[in-house]
Amino acid sequence: IYKRSDLKIEQKVIGPAIISEATGTNVIERGWLGSLDKYYNLILSRAEEKKSEKGLGTSVDVVMLEVFNNLFMNIAEQMGATLANTAYSVNIKERLDFSCALFDNSGALVANAPHVPVHLGSMSEAIRTVIKLNKNDIFPGDVFVLNAPFNGGTHLPDVTVITPVFDSDGKQITFFVASRGHHADIGGKTPGSGPPDSKHIDEEGVLIDNFKMFDKGVFRESEIRKILSSGRYPCRNIEHNMADLAAQVAANNTGIVEINSMIEQFGIETVHSYMNHVQDNAEECIRNAIVNLREGKYEYELDNGEFIRVKITIDKIKREATIDFTGTAPKNPFNYNAPMAVCHAVILYVFRTLVGSNIPLNEGCFKPLNIVVPNNSMINAKYPSAVIAGNTEVSQLTCNALFGALGIIAGSQATMNNFIWGNDKIQNYETICGGTGAGPNFHGTSAVQTHMTNTRSTDPEILEARFPVRLEEYSIRKNSGGKGMFNGGDGVTRKLRFLEPMTVTTLCSHRRVKPFGVCLLYTSPSPRDISR
């Protein structure tokens, strides 16, 4: 690794190497030379005749490990760019409520883009469901759709499109790519698919479990339309669903092209080897972080008087952690329930945040973690539990509980402040931002999405152009964060005026119980919902 400012004119840098400078980084691959000409331009030239890079080898090269870290993440980022550019809905196109990732041929997460954490840590189970239910029936050109919360989904509006990637002979699956997008409406009792009083999954919309939308390249359009229009509460705007599904297919196709390009350049053996090295590196980073943690437990009270209970124990010899949720409340009779995939996503996110280096979120992060979750509890709900608030509220509450047990940061707003509104013609979904918790030597941040969500606020001009609504105020709610030596971040005030009748749903938390502080000075005031 070289600093460009340290290089002399005509000094040769033999690849593989990295040359860093204030405004960028240059990677010199094996078989290339880099040098500065008399004008200090960096000139790259081939040092040897081009050979197939399939001979790159399978042992770990630290430079190539970093290259592949970024290659894998970049593929997911390119998928996300395609999805944002081609989607129809404001929810996906503007709010960026989607995630893209690539997986190995067993369904293990390899890499993701920095999209929505609650999506990314839960998608592996969706891939494994497709593999399990379609054994010997997956072919080139197939595309699968799934939103079933109990088979790797989160809640019904989050629809996952999964595409296998085959080798050049079309015989062996080398990877899977997947995109998960929050559709503005997937049916249900209320517009936007967020009924506050749902007790059964059927009341929340259309459930899609392992549907093959493309069969060997043939689009089964009539069949998917039939599914979207089925059930007690069908989708309200199927054309919008179809447009966003098409965008997700396009995103996956981008991933396939990028993966095949990488395989063409480096060879499948090298790509698969570094895929494993990337996961091994993530595992080692998590193990190194674990030895610096302290054991702890936390009882996290919810607004309904129930508790999420968690105990974290550390084995510093094995460098492993056990996360035990024994004692957590049983399944909620309404919709504050999360499937196991969401619980896994939260744990993966929390432990990934403990790593200072820029590693991709992947399956390796799970290997040092032993997870104990009571069966049929509110964080391990089974069919036919209602789960619309699980992906949003329960994930945030569980995340705060884990940070409480670790004692490393104060509680965030711990809610996504889901604000869902619409009618038979239009539907929209928002998560309203808030404040992050303070740390041992820093203040929290005001007016941001926290933890398990990572979406954007819709641009006011686009919001008012696409919907019959006027945004009257969007401001920071000053001094609303918890007070202490280091203060929690402030929340926001958001006022909308509807220009025609709408049904409004809110799914929120911490209206009675305040987020916790560390060292317990002052907690934040409770949020307020709707003024009339």
Task: Show the residue positions of the predicted features.
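C-terminal, non-catalytic interaction/recognition modules in large multi-subunit enzymes and RNPs
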Residues: 1-524, 528, 532
